[in-house]
Curated annotation (Swiss-Prot):
Annotated S-S bridges: none
Complex and partners: Homodimer.
One Pfam match: SPOUT_MTase
Gene name of this polypeptide: rlmH
Protein name per Swiss-Prot or TrEMBL: Ribosomal RNA large subunit methyltransferase H
Family affiliation: Belongs to the RNA methyltransferase RlmH family.
Source organism of this protein record: Sulfurimonas denitrificans (strain ATCC 33889 / DSM 1251) (Thiomicrospira denitrificans (strain ATCC 33889 / DSM 1251))
InterPro entries with a match to the protein in the record: Alpha/beta_knot_MTases, RlmH-like, tRNA_m1G_MTases_N
Lineage, broadest ranks: Bacteria, Pseudomonadati, Campylobacterota, Epsilonproteobacteria, Campylobacterales
Location within or outside the cell: Cytoplasm
Amino acid sequence: MNIEILSIAKKERSIYDPLCKELSKMISRFAKIEDIELFNKDVTKAHTISPEASREAYSKLFAPHVVKSFNVILHPDGKLIDSYEFSKLLDGKIAVKFFIGGAYGFEDEFLKKGDSIISLGNITMSHKIAKVVLLEQIYRGFSILSNHPYHK
């Protein structure tokens, strides 16, 4: 299985990088995983214009990546699911892509392209923390599917 985590983010070092690296290593026993951070001058410019312009810039940046996979969009208004339901998102898939939006979320048109729209909870968190939570849930999901004791 191939997993891609795509996020709107500047490529910069973070205190969360070692944890993301460790979780990715744990996941690599089950699947190939790739972390893709996207950001360009159009996003920078859009941030100075309006939230709507920002959402449009995010959609354009993500658009080429919404192909040939099961696309999961993380969104505050998405479905709240538990770890067992999350594991079903991974079960039997060849490729799964997770999309973490920027500060202004997603355009409605982009949300329609998702195969599943989920929420990590009702609290607001930075995309860096959302990525850590997502990675942990991916590992937990594979642990559930393979009856690994990590989940207990």
